[in-house]
From Swiss-Prot:
Protein name per UniProt: Holo-[acyl-carrier-protein] synthase
InterPro entries from the UniProt entry: 4-PPantetheinyl_Trfase_dom (IPR008278), 4-PPantetheinyl_Trfase_dom_sf (IPR037143), ACPS (IPR002582), Ppantetheine-prot_Trfase_dom (IPR004568)
EC number: 2.7.8.7
Lineage, uppermost ranks: Bacteria, Pseudomonadati, Pseudomonadota, Gammaproteobacteria, Alteromonadales
Family: Belongs to the P-Pant transferase superfamily. AcpS family.
UniProt-listed GO biological process terms: fatty acid biosynthetic process
Necessary cofactors: Mg(2+)
Native species: Shewanella baltica (strain OS155 / ATCC BAA-1091)
Length: 127
């Protein structure tokens, strides 16, 4: 296995909270997939959830080497959790096409948050 992509992003949670207070769920609807949006809506700390997903998707787009845009949308990256609660990452559409261009086979993700910040790191590997 070889690392073909690495991305990290950090988000100030208060900034996301302020955006949600000002614009409602507009950002959430742009960033989150339908499944993620359902979790966000029911979450006890929706702004924190959104900040972590935003950081994760930005980190994934950086690992792909494209950033958001250039064929990769927030909607093409899904962040879930496995049965143990660890975060997982799945690519579709433009993000999947870029993953295939890189001849990548797996993505690893780590997400953390503290009082004021959410941070995520994504590593993409090929065989």
């Amino acid at each position: 296995m070889a690392i073909v992509g690495l991305g990290t992003d950090i988000v100030e949670i208060e900034r996301i909270q302020a955006h949600v207070a000002r614009a409602g769920d507009k950002l959430a609807k742009r960033v989150l997939t339908e499944v993620e949006l359902a979790i966000y809506t029911a979450h006890s700390q929706p702004s924190r959830y959104l900040a972590k997903r935003f950081a994760a998707k930005e980190a994934a787009a950086k690992a792909l080497g494209t950033g958001i845009g250039r064929g990769v949308s927030f909607q093409h990256i899904h962040i879930g959790n496995n049965e143990d609660g660890a975060p997982t990452i799945h690519f579709t559409e433009g993000a999947l096409a870029r993953l295939q261009q890189l001849k990548a086979t797996v993505g690893h993700i780590s997400i953390a948050d503290e009082k004021s910040y959410a941070i995520a790191t994504v590593i993409i590997e090929s065989q």
